[in-house]
């Protein structure tokens, strides 16, 4: 299955090992209909779909076998859920979203202006 990764399993991030050698198809962007938040003090991103005011989120597209998918899911936080999302080229891929109501409840910061998790993490490691 085609799976969009936009967080801690990106190339160079700590959870990339959870992909179990999945085939990287390349950099990819979502359609401009999502928001990106830093969840649990920067532990992982949370994205959710919006009707307006969304951005294209930069990430990576992978081809996963059922075993690789199971390995990835085992490392995902329990609040996240898998859905089919739209990519910027009109195609679709599976991805993990985070419930908007939990983001709002906890006041997790909107980091959409960074355009992706890797840019956000690079900005936080450059500080202090």
Regions found by a protein language model. Name each.
Residues 1-128:
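Glycine-aromatic micro-motifs
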């Amino acid at each position: 299955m085609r799976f969009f990764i936009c967080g801690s399993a990106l190339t160079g991030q700590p959870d990339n090992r959870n992909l179990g050698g999945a085939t990287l198809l390349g950099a990819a962007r979502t359609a401009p209909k999502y928001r990106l938040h830093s969840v649990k003090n920067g532990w992982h991103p949370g994205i959710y779909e919006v009707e307006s005011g969304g951005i294209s989120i930069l990430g990576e597209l992978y081809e996963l076998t059922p075993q690789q998918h199971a390995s990835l899911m085992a490392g995902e936080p329990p609040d996240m859920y898998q859905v089919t999302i739209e990519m910027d080229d009109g195609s679709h891929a599976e991805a993990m979203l985070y419930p908007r109501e939990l983001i709002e409840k906890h006041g997790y910061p909107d980091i959409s202006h960074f355009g992706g998790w890797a840019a956000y993490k690079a900005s936080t490691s450059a500080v202090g």
